[in-house]
Every structure is written in structure tokens, then in C-alpha cells.
Amino acid sequence: MSLLLAPPSYFPFRGLRRSTAAKQPPCLRLVKCTADRQSPEAARRSAHYQPNMWSDDYIQSLTVESPLKVEEKEQTKKLMLLKERIAEVICEGKEVEEQLRLIDHLQQLGVAYHFKDDIKASLRNIHSSLEEISSTIIFKDGLHASALLFRLLRENGFSISEDIFEEFRDEKGQYFRSDGLKNQTDQAMLSLYEASYYEKDGEMVLQEAMECTTKHLENLLEEEGSDLKLKEQAAHALELPLNWRMERLHARWFIEACQREVMVIDNPLLLEFAKLDFNAVQSIYKKELSALSRWWTKLGVVEKLPFARDRLTENYLWTVGWAFEPEHWSFRDAQTKGNCFVTMIDDVYDVYGTLDELELFTHVVDRWDINAIDQLPDYMKILFLALFNTVNDDGYKVMKEKGLDVIPYLKRSWADLCKAYLVEAKWYHRGYKPTINEYLDNTWISISGPAIFTNAYCMANNLTKQDLERFSEYPAIAKHSSMLGRLYNDLATSTAEIERGDVPKSIQCCMHERGVSEGVAREQVKELIRGNWRCMNGDRAAASSFEEMLKTVAVDIARASQFFYHNGDKYGKADGETMTQVMSLLINPII
């Protein structure tokens, strides 16, 4: 398969609302899972993963019929009325900066998806008058307004040059250095900081802006007497910039920050609407998760592969990170199922299977032939049959609804994934240490990004025959997104995986190939991360709503990876923060 590669510079090494009370997480007894051996000769490893934290009984309890049906109907009616009023507000004639603030608030509150066409039309009008707008006093002399304009246009796929910041050179002719910005407000520096994370390859102005604003905000946190609300905003931004954040998690934070008046929005209707919408969408998530839990329990694969991670709820949380809007329910359904199989198959290749078994399994998946399973050991027969039936069922639904045969594309992505897993298994069993380039060329596929992207492509609501015929290779943005998932994963999991016995990760490849310390290797991996983000930022423009959806999913794959692997492995060890965020996004409504 031919692939569109990144520029060489970035591979330098060559439910129902029943109560306003917060739902409590389930308390389950921790059990160490051990696996039955397939044969006395086979040496089986075990990672001793944490067991599932979310029982099916608990998940089903989230959607028990509620006595508050009348109240829910009233809330739905109120939601629709507020939506109509906000649509009118968007269409009102406003000054450009006021329009930008409104769009920014809608996006950060997580409700912009209701007004996509209106927002796109507003930004298109602004973009068509960009030269005139940027010369006005408020943008010429206002760093905050200019940074907001820049970020929103880039974020929504419009072209805008970093030259918009030319007016903000300091007296020495440098950008954002010396004392040139000491009179700019802290809020403006925060806006510029967020804008700088939309930089493309070679944009030195934005790189300097990132350095300067990061230092400024760090100093702000240390200053006594500074505005506490602004300090909280700065701390949130320094932890992760907006462009790197999982959208739904940020939306909840932003709504609650507005409730605490840490953030100020111009129109109180927006906050009221956002709270109602968040809770309404959360009810949808509960119902989707409940149906998926019934499917997973009935499938019974967990009992047959007790050595593997059982992570249905966390797998669903991934999909909310990738496509949170209610309209993408079919993608969330198919991809949650896919995530469960990715996890199980990954553990077979990484931990449990012998090399001979793995070669057989890869061959059977590549053939996609149910008649070939007789050559597999029993545990693999169950796994392949479950995968085969589930993927074919997803393909059948698309065929029934759209008359399109997506099964060849789905099975190709699973074959690619298993082949990449097999390469890593051979490296491990043969004690081979790959170069960093060899490693990255294989593992951007083994992180499962292409399989996720393929599911998004095939489950898209507006998929056409022509779109399907064009899907002959993975686009560049899918590669960059997958690479980010791989690198984030490596930073979080490599130490534990090497200790239990696994192939060298990107960090160890750098250390071995270049003779550097682990600390230096980690910094080199972080630079790869920044480089791939720059590439993705340069590929956000879309020619159609279909392409726009796919590129958004690609970006959100990276954002969700950042969440799950930021400051540790929150997927393998699914208690702690992961449990907190499951409760926040999927279970507890906003009060």
C-alpha cells in the first residue's frame, strides 16, 4: 500500500437523567487474571492487567426507566427553544470581534456542532474580508483580537498567515521578545499562547510566540496578587493547549468554569443551553454504552481470553473523544466493538501467543476465510470468529442502508494491523532491535490508527460510492494522527512494557541507535510529537463536509491519545483519572 509520508524533517532519525445526584462508581473486587495454557510446551507470559472496573449490571442500571419523563420532555422542549434563539443571535449583525467571541464560546462550550453552517458562513465572510479587517484598529493594535481571529480561522480550516502578527514586533525588531509585550494584557498573552499551537511547518513567528507566552504564563502563576481566575485559566492552558485537548472533556471543564465565573461569556443563554445539551447528549451515551455492554457480555470472549484487558467502557470513552456528536452514533458503536478486538488481539500478540500461533492467526485474518480457522488453537478460533462476525455485521448494515460494500476496506485494515503486530512479535522473539525509522514505519499502523480511520470512513453518514472508490491509501493526516498516538503511547507505557518483556519502543530505539540517555531520547520523541502536530495543522483545510469530518476525527484521535497517555497509562491502568473522567463524561450530569 502506498502511503503519503510526512516531510523528512519530522522523521529526523530517518441514557436517562434519573437524578441530579452524582452517580458513584462501582466498587469491584480486584482479581488477578491468569490464563490457561494451550499446551504444556508453550511458555505464556502475563501482564497481570487490572480487571474490568465497570460491571454490566452497573452499566445497565444507568438506563433504568426514570419517573422524570415529563421533566425530561420539558427539558428537551426548552433545549430546542434555546437553540432557535441562539441561532438568531449568531445571524445578528455584530462587530467582528464580538462574532469571534461568540463562535469561540460556542466551540468551547461544546455546542458549536448545532450551528455548523452558520458558524462556517460567518467565518467565511470574515475570511473574505481579512485584509480589511486586520487593518482596523482593534486588530492592528489588539493582540487578543488578532490571536483569536487567527486561531478560529486555522481551527476551522481557513488559510491565514502568521504575518498577521507583524504589527507586534518589539522595539528591537524581534517577535515577542525583550519587553515588547510587557504592556499587553495577560488575557492577550493567553490568547496568543493558544493560537501558537496551530503553527505549521517553518512558522518561526509562532514558535517564538509559543516560547514567549509559555514563559509569560508560567511567571503569571508565580506572581502574588495576580487575578486568581486568570491564573486558573493559565494553569489549564499550560497543562495542555486547547488544540491538544479532548473536546468533550474541555467542554465540561469550560461549562463548570463559567458556572464558577472563572470564565465570562457575553450571553447567559449560551451557558444554559450548553448545560442542557451536555446532559442530553450524556443520556444518549448511557444508552449506547448500555447496548454495547449487553453485546460484549453476550459475546463471551472475555471468559475465553482471561489474560487480555477487558476495557469496554474505556473503549467507548475513546470513541466519544473521536466523534462526540450524536449523529456519529454508528461510528461509536462500530468502533467501540473494534477497540475491544484491537485490545484483545494486541494482548494476544504482545503477551500470550506463541510465534507459530501468531503467524497462523495473521494468515487467517489476511485471508478473511472462516473455513481456515481449523488450523488455529481454540482461543484464537473464538477470537477470530467473533471478529469476523462483528466486522461483517457492520459491513452488512452499511450495505443495507447505503448499498455500499465496505467489507473489503474493513478487512484490509484488520489485515494491516495484524501484519504490523506480527512484525513486532518477530522482533521480540528474535531479540531484534529496530532502528527508529524501522520502528516508526511499522508502529504507526500497529497503534491501530489506520483501522480507526477506516471505520470512520466506512461508517460516515454521507459516504458515497465515489468516496469509497477513492479510498485506496491512508491520507497523510491519518499517518500523522496515528504517529502521535504511537508516540504518546510510548512515552507513557514503554518502561512497564520493557520490564515485562516487549519490543523496544521509540525511546529505546533512540537510545540504542544514537547512544543517548533516556532523558534525551524522551525529548527527541517529544520533538517528533511537535513535528507531527505541525504537519496536521497544515492539513486541516477540507473540500467537503465528508473530508472535514474525516480530518476532524484524525485530529481527535491524537487528542484522545494525549488524554489517555498524558502523565501515565490511563488505559492499561483504568482506575484513578480514567474512572473520574468516565463518571464526568458518561455518567454524572452537570448540576
From Swiss-Prot:
Cofactor-binding details, from the entry: Binds 3 Mg(2+) or Mn(2+) ions per subunit.
Q: How does activity depend on pH?
A: Optimum pH is 7.5. Active at pH between 6.0 and 9.0.
Q: Which Gene3D superfamilies match?
A: Farnesyl Diphosphate Synthase, Terpene synthase, N-terminal domain
Tell me yes or no: is Transferase among this UniProt entry's keywords: no
Annotated Pfam families: Terpene_synth, Terpene_synth_C
The prosthetic group or cofactor this protein requires is:
Mg(2+); Mn(2+)
EC class, as a word, reads lyase
Q: Which InterPro entries match?
A: Isoprenoid_synthase_dom_sf, Terpene_cyclase-like_1_C, Terpene_cyclase_plant_C1, Terpene_synth_N, Terpene_synth_N_sf, Terpene_synthase-like, Terpene_synthase_metal-bd, Terpenoid_cyclase/PrenylTrfase
Q: How does activity depend on temperature?
A: Optimum temperature is 30 degrees Celsius.
- Give the residues the record marks as binding Mg(2+) 2: D346, D350
State the EC number(s).
4.2.3.81, 4.2.3.-, 4.2.3.55, 4.2.3.47
> Does Lipid metabolism show up as a keyword for this record?
no
Where's it found, cell-wise? Plastid, Chloroplast
A GO MF term = magnesium ion binding
One GO cellular component from the entry?
chloroplast
The transit peptide region is found at 1-46
Q: Which residues bind Mg(2+) 1?
A: D346, D350
- Where does the entry say this protein is expressed, by tissue? Highly expressed in flowers, petals and sepals, but almost undetectable in vegetative organs.
The UniProt annotation places Mg(2+) 3 binding at E497
**UniProt motif DDXXD motif: location:** 346-350
Q: What does this protein do?
A: Sesquiterpene and monoterpene synthase involved in the biosynthesis of volatile compounds present in floral scent. Mediates the conversion of (2E)-geranyl diphosphate (GPP) into linalool, with trace levels of myrcene, limonene and (Z)-beta-ocimene. Also acts as a sesquiterpene synthase by catalyzing the conversion of farnesyl diphosphate (FPP) to alpha-bergamotene and beta-bisabolene and to minor products including alpha-curcumene, cis-alpha-bisabolene, beta-farnesene and beta-sesquiphellandrene, as well as seven other unidentified sesquiterpenes.
Its family remark reads:
Belongs to the terpene synthase family. Tpsa subfamily.
- According to its record, what is known about the domains? The Asp-Asp-Xaa-Xaa-Asp/Glu (DDXXD/E) motif is important for the catalytic activity, presumably through binding to Mg(2+).
Q: What is this protein called?
A: Monoterpene synthase 8, chloroplastic
